[in-house]
Amino acid sequence: IGKKIFIFPLLFMFVMIICAFLYHNSISYVENRTSISENANVLAKDLLNSRISVYQFMLETNIDKRDKVIENFETLSKNIALFKNRLHIPKNILLCEESIELISTYLKIFNNMANIKLKENNENLKEYNQDILKMANIGKDLENKIFALNEDIVNIRNDAIKALTTQLTILGFITILIFFLASSFISRNIAKSLNNFKDGLQS
């Protein structure tokens, strides 16, 4: 009987070790997804700040404002490249690569537009207007890609949280079931042992 009762603490320790292992792996994954989601939000904010700096250049045209635009977009490009290294899903990696290419194209067009505006050369007004239109289209495309990336990352994070909740629920149910079956088995064996002992005394 003593040996059978001793199974309980061993079973409890075994189940707790499994629970701790699964929880550690699951929570680490959720924390990683949450961190990536936060970085994706930062990229969206960086894009907004970069585009605002373009409008500021248009309102107050000078070299400092131009350099600020270039600095903001180059920083955004570097941050996207770093962010891409943390991703594993091909479509999100592709979104990052396409965003970096768009930024490169955007800056080339912006530099040309900025030079025309800084020189106040009316002879190149048509080219200037064309550059503005191209920048608007590229900016919108870039915005869509970063927002799509951000949305997908948020969905992945939410799915990870749901998966963790489901795993813990299933684990709790299995734990209760194991203890119930184990206790029933041990109780029957104890009762059987006691009956055998009783029969032995009466014989």
Regions found by a protein language model. Name each.
Residues 2, 59, 64-66, 84-156, ...:
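Polar/charged, Q/E/K-enriched amphipathic alpha-helical segments with strong coiled-coil propensity
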Residues 52, 78, 137, 192, ...:
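Generic recognition of well-ordered alpha-helical segments
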Residues 49, 56, 75, 82, ...:
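The DHp (HisKA) dimerization/phosphotransfer helix of two-component histidine kinases
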Residues 2-52, 85-103, 124-131, 158-165:
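Amphipathic alpha-helical segments and their boundaries
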Residues 25-35, 58, 185-188, 192:
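Juxtamembrane transmembrane-helix termini
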